[in-house]
Structures are given as structure tokens and as C-alpha cells.
Regions:
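Short, structured segments at the rim of ligand-binding sites
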Residues: 1-386
Length: 386
């Protein structure tokens, strides 16, 4: 089907999760608007409620009022943490405000490098002691967190968020360098400042945080979801569609816009809206995922579907996450010709998608299968949608 019409983009999932976790820093009332209605946000709200947060959600689930008084439990249970990778983000605020935390480790005690090590080693520099026992991180900072100079060994969105939140209540000054600079991190930083935090970006990937003792009430509107926006732009490009995307900041989407122009889409952009018209001929392209402002790993699966329709062979190199090619077996069921070599997918073009019964493995795989179904011949049934 050719998509035509106008779509208003939801609030950002990837900004909502750390912002919700950051509310744990304060005992004041906080109001958040433009929350997206997605499973991970609901799970994060349940996690906060299980710890004692008082949460009121509006009928349309778009606005939330939250208050975290002194009766917050400093434990985040496995049951909720296991369904959401971002749950680890409560570690920083709990240690900053209460000096202790018992948080289920995402993925338990796997041997070898775990991304969580970046969080823990950085927190150690701020005075945190920790042990991992039975899949739980038992951490404490008996004398409170102390400001430190921290250079992340690798760019990590989660570690940047956790340490930025934690540093807001630390004694003295913290300087974080080699930070992730995704727009969602800038949104988190703006939210923390709206509560009274002292945060200054002193370089492209460097931020200075001066600890404060108390926070004030805040009303904050969460930014738009750039991954949803990118997905909708691809939906417009894939089958000669004609879509108007609103509720966005087009300057944040420059990478996606440039990519789609290269493959042949016609794009007319204004500050808060984009009109995209898909071309009959889709040009092939080779891409690799990388930290912002590079191609987002969260849009890789959707781009793969688009490149299945290209005129020649394309490649996608996944440089951020392992296990990010899980949609490929399902796309093959729909007639896609894709070969995986290590962290690279080789995509043969000119695919004529055929309807099939398929199963989603994660949120982005769900979106990619919907895109494939849009231009498939026949009926497609997608189960386990996220």
C-alpha cells in the first residue's frame, strides 16, 4: 500500500526512560508531558511504583505527575528489570539520593565485557563500592557521592545518562568526557536543569556538573521520538508514499534526511515538519551504525527493509549492538535475500516481498516487519508485536 497523509510523531521513548528514572533524585512534584504510550515506559512506571513512587497518569496516558518522597525502596527487582534494558538507569539516582541501591543486573553475570561495567567503574570513581551477588548489583556510597573527573572508555548512552543523573547530587564538581551526545541525552540534561541541576556542556562530548543539595518542582515536555520519525520517513519512501511528518525538529533528523535523499526520496523540510515523497527507483547504499550524529542502531532494521527494495546490492554494518540482525530470518520468510557475515548484512536488492506469518523479536524488528508488510503481495500476520 502507498502511504499518504499526515502523521504527528509521539514523545521519545529513549528520552522518557532516563527522565522518569531521574525523578528519583527529588522529593518535589514533577509533571511530564508528551510521554509515549509504549511498553517500556509503562514498565518503567511500574518499576518506580514498585519502589514507592506516587504516580498519576492522565486518561490519555500522555501526561504524568510523579512524587518520590522519603519512603522510596532502594531495590529494583529482577521481574521488571529483566524486561527492559534501560532499567539500570535507576542505579545512579538511588545512589545519589539514598547512598545505596540493590538493582538487578541486566543479563546477570555473563563472563567477558558487559556494558554495565562502564557504569560501575565510573560510579566507583565517585565513591561507590559494589558487589554483584546472585545477579544483583549491591552498591553503596556511605559518605555520599563525590564529584570526579571521568572519561568513559567507550561512548555509552546509558553510562552517560546514569552518571549525569548521579552527579547532580554529588558533592562538588563532576566532569564527564567522551560522553554520548544523542538528542535524548541533551533532553535529559535540559530536564535536570529544569529541576535546578547545574549542568554545562563545555565541549562536544564533555559536560560539567556541579552538585546541588535540593531540587524544585518541574513541568517538562519530553522531546519527539526521532526513531519513530525516521521510521515514518522510511515508510513514506518505501512504496512511493507521500507523507507529512509533524511535531518534530527537522535539524535533529539531518542524518536520516541525507540518507533518504541519497536513495532517491524527495524531501521538503521546514523547522517542525517534513514532507517526503517516495521514488519508484530506490538507489542502493552502504551504511554503518555509529553513535549520534551517525546512523542510529535503532533505525537499522527499518533501513534494511528499504534497501531490500533498492536497485542493487547494499550493505549494513552494525557497530553498536550485537544481536541486532534478529529480524532477518523473518524478512527471509517474506522473500528477502539477505546474508549475514559477522556484524555486516549484505542485502540483495529488487526484492518483491510476499505476505507471510512472521514474529517480531523486539520493538524495532516489529517496525521493520510492518514496513515489509506494507509493500508485500498478499496478507502478512505479525505476532508478538512490541
Amino acid at each position: 500500500a502507498k502511504l499518504k497523509g499526515q502523521i504527528r510523531i509521539s514523545g521519545s521513548k529513549n528520552a522518557s526512560l532516563p527522565i522518569l528514572a531521574a525523578t528519583l533524585l527529588s522529593n518535589k512534584k514533577i509533571s511530564l508531558t508528551n510521554l509515549p504510550r509504549v511498553k517500556d515506559v509503562e514498565t518503567m512506571i511500574k518499576l518506580l511504583e514498585s519502589m514507592g513512587s506516587k504516580v498519576k497518569v492522565s486518561k490519555n496516558k500522555n501526561t504524568l505527575v510523579i512524587k518520590n518522597d522519603k519512603k522510596i525502596k532502594t531495590e529494583a527487582s529482577y521481574n521488571l528489570m529483566s524486561t527492559m534494558r534501560a532499567g539500570i538507569i535507576v542505579l545512579g539516582p538511588l545512589l545519589a539520593r539514598f547512598g545505596k541501591a540493590r538493582v538487578s543486573s541486566p543479563g546477570g553475570c555473563n563472563i567477558g565485557f558487559r556494558p554495565i561495567d562502564i557504569h560501575l567503574e565510573a560510579l566507583k570513581k565517585m565513591g561507590v563500592k559494589y558487589k554483584i551477588i546472585d545477579g544483583y548489583i549491591n552498591a553503596n556510597a556511605k559518605n555520599g557521592l563525590v564529584g570526579a573527573k571521568i572519561k568513559f572508555p567507550k561512548i555509552s548512552v546509558g553510562a552517560t545518562e546514569n552518571l549525569m543523573i548521579a552527579a547532580c547530587l554529588a558533592k562538588g564538581q563532576t566532569v564527564l568526557s567522551n560522553c554520548a551526545i544523542e538528542p535524548e541525552i541533551k533532553d535529559l540534561s535540559n530536564f535536570l536543569c529544569s529541576m535546578g541541576a547545574k549542568i554545562v556542556w563545555t565541549g562536544r562530548r564533555q559536560v560539567k556538573i556541579i552538585g546541588v543539595k535540593t531540587f524544585k518542582q518541574s513541568n517538562y515536555k519530553i522531546m519527539f521520538d526521532r526513531i519513530e520519525a525516521g521510521t515514518m520517513l522510511i515508510a513514506g519512501a518505501i512504496n512511493q508514499g507521500n507523507l507529512k511528518i509533524t511535531g518534530i525538529e527537522s535539524s535533529i533528523l539531518e542524518t536520516e534526511i541525507d540518507l533518504l535523499k541519497k536513495i532517491g526520496a524527495k524531501i521538503n523540510q521546514k523547522k517542525n515538519e517534513i514532507i517526503i515523497k517516495g521514488n519508484k527507483k530506490i538507489k542502493n547504499i552502504n551504511i554503518k551504525t555509529s553513535p549520534y550524529p551517525g546512523v542510529a542502531t535503532d533505525i537499522q532494521a527499518q533501513l534494511m527493509v528499504l534497501l531490500c527494495k533498492a536497485n542493487k546490492r547494499s550493505t549494513i554494518k552494525e557497530d553498536i549492538f550485537e544481536n541486532r540482525f534478529q529480524s532477518i530470518p523473518e524478512l527471509k520468510r517474506m522473500n528477502a535475500k539477505i546474508e549475514v557475515k559477522g556484524n555486516q548484512a549484505i542485502i540483495e536488492g529488487n526484492t518483491i516481498f510476499k505476505g507471510a506469518q512472521v514474529m517480531a523479536t523486539d520493538l524495532r524488528a516489529s517496525a521493520s516487519l510492518v514496513l515489509a508488510a506494507l509493500c508485500a503481495k498478499g496478507k502478512t500476520t505479525i505476532s508478538r508485536i512490541y
